[in-house]
């Protein structure tokens, strides 16, 4: 039998615990999915460097979350709220961001290669030096977005 492992998700601004999950062999992915299933408020959650590759995050409220350098490759983020999220250097390769709200998100240096951004709201997002190779941007709102680099 493995040992019980507790993982806490903290607010990036206040440091307060917004969700805690304990189970045998726990991972950050299981903790985030548990938080979403239980309707926890992940607004401003600090998930810096988290491995959420392949996770089902459809409709998740990650408004203002710190996902800097997180691995979201292949994740399902359809209709997720990522307004003002810090996704600097995040790996979103082959992620499904269809109809996601990425208004004012920091996507500098993010890898969006092959990502589905169809219908995504990228108004005011910073995509400087982001890799958009083979990304689907059909019907995406790029007004005011920074696409330099």
Each model region followed by its residue ranges:
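Extended, small-residue-rich solenoid/repeat segments and analogous flexible loops
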Residues: 1-118, 123, 128, 133, ...
